[in-house]
Amino acid sequence: MPIFRFTALAMTLGLLSAPYNAMAATSNPAFDPKNLMQSEIYHFAQNNPLADFSSDKNSILTLSDKRSIMGNQSLLWKWKGGSSFTLHKKLIVPTDKEASKAWGRSSTPVFSFWLYNEKPIDGYLTIDFGEKLISTSEAQAGFKVKLDFTGWRAVGVSLNNDLENREMTLNATNTSSDGTQDSIGRSLGAKVDSIRFKAPSNVSQGEIYIDRIMFSVDDARYQWSDYQVKTRLSEPEIQFHNVKPQLPVTPENLAAIDLIRQRLINEFVGGEKETNLALEENISKLKSDFDALNIHTLANGGTQGRHLITDKQIIIYQPENLNSQDKQLFDNYVILGNYTTLMFNISRAYVLEKDPTQKAQLKQMYLLMTKHLLDQGFVKGSALVTTHHWGYSSRWWYISTLLMSDALKEANLQTQVYDSLLWYSREFKSSFDMKVSADSSDLDYFNTLSRQHLALLLLEPDDQKRINLVNTFSHYITGALTQVPPGGKDGLRPDGTAWRHEGNYPGYSFPAFKNASQLIYLLRDTPFSVGESGWNNLKKAMVSAWIYSNPEVGLPLAGRHPFNSPSLKSVAQGYYWLAMSAKSSPDKTLASIYLAISDKTQNESTAIFGETITPASLPQGFYAFNGGAFGIHRWQDKMVTLKAYNTNVWSSEIYNKDNRYGRYQSHGVAQIVSNGSQLSQGYQQEGWDWNRMQGATTIHLPLKDLDSPKPHTLMQRGERGFSGTSSLEGQYGMMAFDLIYPANLERFDPNFTAKKSVLAADNHLIFIGSNINSSDKNKNVETTLFQHAITPTLNTLWINGQKIENMPYQTTLQQGDWLIDSNGNGYLITQAEKVNVSRQHQVSAENKNRQPTEGNFSSAWIDHSTRPKDASYEYMVFLDATPEKMGEMAQKFRENNGLYQVLRKDKDVHIILDKLSNVTGYAFYQPASIEDKWIKKVNKPAIVMTHRQKDTLIVSAVTPDLNMTRQKAATPVTINVTINGKWQSADKNSEVKYQVSGDNTELTFTSYFGIPQEIKLSPLP
């Protein structure tokens, strides 16, 4: 390794007293395989910051405290055309496969840095990588950066996928995610020890500030092209669609636009408090928060202040692995979401402020924050490496811009801000284009930027263009809410579910409902009103949410945030907005739900809605939602969430720092909650045994084995499309769950299987399971009856008439025994060899950070032992249990089981006759011919239900298989059900076809998106 010359640099800086030792600079390589996840950073605030740099005679490197990104100094490079400086750093460029293995997600090694121009330069900065580079030697690979900009810009490229070939003969193809292809970067291998920065040759001289040069592992999806640098990844810019015919410029249309604008301003200044806004109204606090940013204007242009970064731009640093000095400087960054929230709070205060002096100060604060934001590189054409999940960071910038539009115009900043916001909105191009497509129903768009989109359009100064844009926006919102997106795309579904991340996801849909409702409300009663089809579809989704919430959604529907279930109370205002936007307002259904979840009375309704409306009663009966492979059974104030999963619906969402132990979230779960807080009912994370989800059949694993085998995302799907629920008469329901584990997933027993069925009717549910198998000889298989925290108000169990409050407590139950949990739910054991009941102290772990937790819990579970072979179980749950009632039910069971009868229970078919309701539920896990009073044959896997009432037979059927792929839309499935006897339809409105064939009747059900169909039959005379 040669000794690099630093003579010219040392003379310039007076910093170096000895020749540079090249070995010192390269002894700790970047991307060291022993510590691949620790980013290597040059930030010029460190000791001897230029030790690894050299320059030719036409370049001068100095340190400047004028502006910086990381720390208080940057590198100022004064150059003459074609001159260069070199960073001497050994790289061991990993393949994407090696990087991905180290991080546990699709990754790539990235080279990134920041640069600042005080004036645009008509030329390119050339970055070269090679071995023993000097100013005149040929490099092996590199890339170019266009310099025609002012302010800060960030450059970030994949060393495997974004470099251009120089003089080497290489197989210069992109590296696949598994690293099987060579790339320029990989062909360099461990040969790189020099990175050369070469000034444009076509410009006589200039100067550039450079800071925060970094080598790090980053997500392979997020090195985006922009106006400065070309990478393999591009985010196309927005092209506004214009609907035809366009509305003319008339006083009426302009007045409507102004009305919408004022409504929007009024909502954000004085309307409903935003759930995701840290509202601050204290002027002194706003000023102190502003002062903490340390923003000041520089004499010759630009600003200096704390560096701004989005919460997702943090990732490229791998902050958990930074050394202590780098971490300290990194921690001084300001998160853009907090910054733009302050901008909004200042803009809101500005609108409300009456004192001229105070108002002027707020205005100057806002304008300086805007200038700093732009100077930091948040401008049109600047990708800043990536700005994914932009809406969460920037949503309040858009709204503040509308509130401060006059001040921005006066300062000649509005056009630049408008262009910047439009540029960064391109992540939601499928929405901002306003042309309905498969990707146009993005719930995250509604959640974060839909109202901001409208605010941006209202800034358009040209009257005709502004009318066109708002009119197109209205048509787009109508279409986005109306369409059924194909495959797993975001949007509303025919059964009332609302999809995000390829599944029903209240954590995303609830705020999206609220914001979509507000948009419809803002546009109401104008030529720009949202169409009725969009309104109707949103109403269906929001009424469905009312059904599957109590008011929180159950743990099985909480996504990656268990014990933080979204509540309808957080989106109550959305029901008001949508009710008041009805064609004939208010819509009575939505208005009554609003009153109920807002705890408003009938007496208050007149002042709210202008007429007397009774608050909605809690839903009752059974509702199938196969868009989420779940069913909801409501009885009085209790809600039972029955949850399965299949090839179309994932079991749980597990992230790197979320829901690490959530594997069993959908394993035939049957969570019971009363109306109110789930925490108050014992659903507490501290001490929670993650193996024991209520109703689930699981292998009881130590936490280290239960922890997801994937370091990052796991959204496990089933091996079959069949698993889900059905309903009958809106009152009765059934779940069928076919549990089959994958064959090749670490820490998942490939031989773990179970068939689980539940029949729900009124105040009781019947649970049966069969074909329970496991090959794990060390871990017990269990079916959990319940698990609740013990608290002062949840401190009692009843077992066979005995009140239990002891702690600790252990006992074993068997067939015929009963117990009542601390929430008043009764459990009658009707077929099980061993049921364990426990009141004990439990030690567990937090789902996000794996830190220990502990708590006291009551639990009961059926113990299937280790390696069960075709094990089975049966039990009943009563939702209105008392010791007296459970004693009566146990007596009925002992008397020849007067409660229910299992007519069949094997790997192909489960049949349950509920004697209390006279409803029969059939889970056809396979097509089958059966011996039964009513059903003779079913030609496809299906859930069939029957109810005999006097002279009529009501039959429903469905397949929970949505018959779709992740890309292709769901299509209907025809189910043929042959029933015994000759019948005719007693329901003219039924869509079920029927035909008598010999002594039987053939029923043809069309199952679309798992929505059950039913028919009422009467005997042929």
Curated annotation (Swiss-Prot):
Mutation effect (residue 653 to A/D): Loss of activity on both chondroitin 6-sulfate and dermatan sulfate
Record-annotated site: Transition state stabilizer: 560
GO biological process: carbohydrate metabolic process; glycosaminoglycan catabolic process
Pfam families: Lyase_8, Lyase_8_C, Lyase_catalyt, Lyase_N
Protein origin, superkingdom: Bacteria
Catalytic activity: Endolytic cleavage of (1->4)-beta-galactosaminic bonds between N-acetylgalactosamine and either D-glucuronic acid or L-iduronic acid to produce a mixture of Delta(4)-unsaturated oligosaccharides of different sizes that are ultimately degraded to Delta(4)-unsaturated tetra- and disaccharides
Active site residues of this protein: 501, 508
Root EC class: lyase
GO CC annotation, single: extracellular region
Signal sequence region: 1-24
CDD domains reported in the protein's UniProt record: GAG_Lyase
Sample GO molecular function, one term: carbohydrate binding
Residues bound to Na(+): 43, 70, 73, 211
Temperature optimum or stability note: Optimum temperature is 37 degrees Celsius.
pH-activity relationship: Optimum pH is 8. Is essentially inactive at pH 9.0.
Subcellular location per the Swiss-Prot or TrEMBL entry: Periplasm
Biological function: Endolytic, broad-specificity glycosaminoglycan lyase, which degrades the polysaccharides chondroitin, chondroitin-4-sulfate, chondroitin-6-sulfate, dermatan sulfate and to a lesser extent hyaluronan, by beta-elimination of 1,4-hexosaminidic bond to unsaturated tetrasaccharides and disaccharides. Is not active against keratan sulfate, heparan sulfate, and heparin. Is able to promote functional recovery in the injured central nervous system (CNS), via its role in the disruption of the normal organization of the extracellular matrix (ECM).
Recorded family membership: Belongs to the polysaccharide lyase 8 family.
Domain free text: Consists of three domains. The middle domain contains the catalytic site in a wide-open cleft.
Record protein name field: Chondroitin sulfate ABC endolyase
